[in-house]
Swiss-Prot record:
Signal peptide coordinates: 1-14
Subunit structure, interactors included: Interacts with glycoprotein L (gL); this interaction is necessary for the correct processing and cell surface expression of gH. The heterodimer gH/gL seems to interact with gB trimers during fusion.
Post-translational modification: N-glycosylated, O-glycosylated, and sialylated.
Listed Pfam families: Herpes_glycoH_C (PF17488), Herpes_glycop_H (PF02489)
InterPro entries linked: Herpes_gH, Herpes_glycoH_C, Herpes_glycoH_C_sf
Glycosylation (residues): N78, N119, N266, N431, N561, N573, N612, N627, N689
Topological domain spans for side Intravirion: 729-733
Topological category with respect to the lipid bilayer: Single-pass type I membrane protein
Chain segments carrying region Interaction with gL: 185-249
Main location as per UniProt: virion
Topology, Virion surface side: 15-707
Function: The heterodimer glycoprotein H-glycoprotein L is required for the fusion of viral and plasma membranes leading to virus entry into the host cell. Following initial binding to host receptor, membrane fusion is mediated by the fusion machinery composed of gB and the heterodimer gH/gL. May also be involved in the fusion between the virion envelope and the outer nuclear membrane during virion morphogenesis.
Lineage: Viruses, Duplodnaviria, Heunggongvirae, Peploviricota, Herviviricetes
Designated name of the protein: Envelope glycoprotein H
């Protein structure tokens, strides 16, 4: 409290020292009649007189040193510029743009929910070993953790929050640091997030001599940083509520420039966006914003405008909003079931920002304790053979997100993902559509896979094969058409419900021409909607990180021409690389015999021996199976794949035969997969032992039926003609 009094009393000069190196004179500085006077006293006291007569305060430095370290006092003294002339101080801050009496007061939703203190029977310490025994088998997360321990790990690094010459007092705090440089340094952002507030410094470099700069601060109204000179936070306050406040520090010249090019027209909307949503809500809003950046090509070519600035400030504010969970004088126990979903949504948002803006740098917001605790929870989860998960799907995937592959030697994470995908895929193959709930679950699966570091032993196991057989199968021609329609409509989008399995498949044959063909089949779309949808899907599917799925395959080092690859079908022992030219070592088959417009080959690659193989010099013909009988008794084709492709359009859809029901539905007389009315569509059967066939039996039967009908028609016409000739002959004989 004494420290706060000290700062408030000294105001512009913030004099805080046990005994200045030289006693300050009591004579007012030249040209100033009301300068604060510093009266020399004993070495343990400092007397400040504000008007020379009536108002003075005596500060006991001995008592202050009990609460404030000596080096901090000295730093504040040096930062206050006590001995510089008032003219210098005035000139230093005279150009600051002031919003005196213009701060907008808003009413927020009230105090948003934070994780309340709990008293769990099992509390986990991050400073000790964490195992399945430590958590007493509570894989549902019914555990307590220390808010201080988690906060100390997330906000671990200590840094100076503001530049030395900034109008805010320099202060060192535990922070999360974030920076982004764009256009070769023409645009620079540096953000610091603490548990009390967040600051964002924005720099626009026009030339070597012309630079514009602004500092935005948002946070707890009572804990905002102090200011130097004659400036107060009331001079630079834009928006405030009972609990929080938004400040903008910039010069008049820079304010004029940024108001035209960068600053939002309505700062109240920015304030409300951050303050009126919980961590989870704000994180999901920002996730959708990042997807919008990606679909519009704004990740590769950033538009440095008000929308971008608002989004970036809100992303930084997520750190601060998470930090409020850990601010308390006394250590308290919080529920893991409450805090983990918040951490998950926030971290997913941060990951998406990093993937969008690849030059983004962040330091901090990592918790080894959460990672180890999540691994212990995963290890305790019971998995029954051929059964689904024993815990809620979202909880499993949120927990798995924080588990490194090195902490999951039994591959329970990948096993669980296959169970989830098996369930979704079973519903999908009925009519080749996905529900919004299924898409959200796939989004969670995607995040768990993206952040997971695979052990080398997991790269060729059956779970990886199953995962990508499922996801690639769900990336069908119908799915591509759905995505084009979804993004073509100017409606409210959602990162969770707009997710497509194509974003985590092993299919890479996307071109603007192909997407236009798929989208053109939807007669409901206008030309503008078609163009918007195709552009969005193409941007999302061809992002820089779109080929990340190949990283988990054991044959990745053996693919020597990735740009040729159209699709990969992974099985446990072999993989099929479908490409426009030979792209991997193995046995290669030519698909050109089926009159495909563009060349396409299929290479059968051994997962374990591809390092020792060379590219095939001989390209074989694909064997053909005529009149293939429908499998009836058992699942003869389980763990095989059927692929359809068009002579003009190329690959269309892949179907993984996961069980007997899928097999029977696929080959039934009512199957919607086989198009009996299109003579230009062909089908390949790829088996898990490296054997492949082209299925032509359906076409042979269909062609024979047509020929028979034609023969009967010709015979009937010939009979009619003969009868006609006989009648005419008898009539005129």
């Amino acid at each position: 409290m004494l420290f706060l009094i000290l700062l408030c009393v000294t105001g512009a000069q913030a004099i805080t020292t046990p005994a200045p190196p030289r006693p300050a004179t009591t004579t007012p500085r030249r040209g100033v009649t009301s300068a604060p006077l510093i009266v020399p006293a004993s070495s343990s006291e400092l007397i400040v007189t504000l008007d020379g007569t009536f108002h003075s305060v005596t500060i006991d430095m001995t008592e202050i040193r009990q609460y404030v370290r000596q080096e901090i006092i000295e730093a504040l003294w040096n930062a206050s510029h006590v001995f510089e002339s008032l003219e210098t101080t005035y000139n230093r801050y005279k150009d600051v743009y002031r919003f005196t009496d213009q701060s907008i007061r808003v009413n927020t939703r009230g105090k948003l929910s934070t994780c309340k203190e709990v008293n769990k029977s099992t509390e986990v310490s991050f400073y000790k070993s964490i195992t399945s025994q430590t958590i007493n088998g509570k894989y549902d997360g019914d555990l307590g953790i220390s808010n201080h321990q988690l906060g100390q790990q997330l906000f671990f690094y200590v840094m100076n929050v503001f530049p030395v010459e900034n109008a805010f007092y320099p202060v060192r705090k535990h922070v999360v640091y974030s920076s982004l440089s764009l256009a070769d340094g023409a645009y620079q952002l540096a953000g610091m997030a603490t548990t009390n507030y967040v600051s964002l410094v924005v720099v626009r470099k026009i030339s070597s001599t012309v630079t514009h700069e602004a500092t935005i601060v948002f946070g707890n109204k009572k804990l905002l940083p102090s200011m130097r000179g004659s400036i107060t936070k009331y001079d630079i306050s834009l928006v405030n509520s009972d609990a929080e406040e938004l400040l903008l520090l910039t010069s008049q010249k820079d304010y004029e420039y940024f108001s035209k090019n960068l600053f939002p027209q309505n700062w109240t909307d920015v304030f409300s966006l951050i303050t009126s949503h919980t961590v989870g809500e704000l994180a999901q809003i920002l996730q959708t914003s990042v997807v919008d950046f990606a679909r519009k090509g704004r990740c590769r070519s950033v538009h440095f405008n008000s929308h971008f600035l608002t989004t970036y400030l809100a992303v930084l504010s997520l750190y601060y909003k998470m930090g409020t969970e850990f601010v308390s004088k006394n250590e308290r126990q919080i529920s893991l079931q409450c805090i983990l979903p918040k951490l998950y949504e926030a971290n997913v948002c941060f990951d998406m920002v990093h993937r969008c803006f690849t030059s983004q740098y962040t330091r901090g917001f990592d918790s080894d304790g959460i990672n180890r605790l999540s691994a212990a929870i995963l290890g305790s989860m019971p998995f029954e053979p051929n059964q689904g998960l024993s815990v809620p799907t979202n909880w499993f995937l949120q927990t798995l997100y924080f588990v490194d592959g090195n902490l999951d030697p039994q591959n329970k994470g990948l096993h669980g993902i296959t169970l989830i995908l098996m369930d979704i895929y079973g519903r999908y193959v009925v009519n080749f559509t996905l529900t919004p709930e299924d898409r959200e679950t796939l989004f969670y699966v995607y995040n768990a896979l993206r952040g997971r570091k695979h052990l080398s032993t997991t790269m060729k196991n059956k779970y990886v094969s199953l995962i990508y057989c499922y996801t690639t199968s769900m990336c069908s021609a119908t799915e591509l058409a759905w995505g084009i329609e979804y993004w073509g409509e100017e409606s409210t989008h959602s990162a969770h419900h707009s997710f497509s399995p194509c974003f985590m498949s092993l299919r890479f044959d996307y071109t603007l021409e192909k997407l236009n063909i798929e989208g053109s089949q939807d007669v409901k779309l206008t030309q503008t909607q078609l163009s918007n949808g195709v552009s969005a899907m193409y941007s999302l599917l061809t992002a820089k990180s779109s080929t990340w799925t190949i990283d988990s395959l054991s044959i990745k080092p053996c693919i020597y021409n990735a740009s040729f690859v159209k699709m990969i079908v992974p099985f446990t022992n072999v993989s099929y690389v479908i490409s426009q030219g030979v792209a991997a070592p193995g046995t290669t088959y030519d698909v050109a015999e089926t009159f495909l417009k563009s060349s396409m080959v299929i290479t059968v690659v051994s997962n374990s021996e591809c390092y020792n193989l060379t590219a095939s010099k001989e390209i074989l013909k694909i064997p053909v199976v005529y009149n293939m009988t429908h499998p009836r008794i058992k699942c003869q084709l389980c763990d095989s794949v059927v692929i359809s492709y068009d002579e003009y359009d190329g690959l269309q859809t892949m179907v993984y035969i996961s069980n007997y029901k899928v097999q029977q539905d696929l080959f039934s007389d009512y199957s919607i997969f086989f198009d009996f009315n299109n003579m230009h569509t062909h089908y390949l059967l790829l088996m898990n032992n490296g054997t492949l066939f082209e299925i032509r039996g359906l076409y042979a039967n269909r062609a024979m039926n047509i020929i028979i009908i034609l023969l009967f028609t010709i015979a009937a016409l010939a009979g009619v003609f003969i009868v006609y000739k006989i009648v005419m002959y008898m009539t005129f004989k």
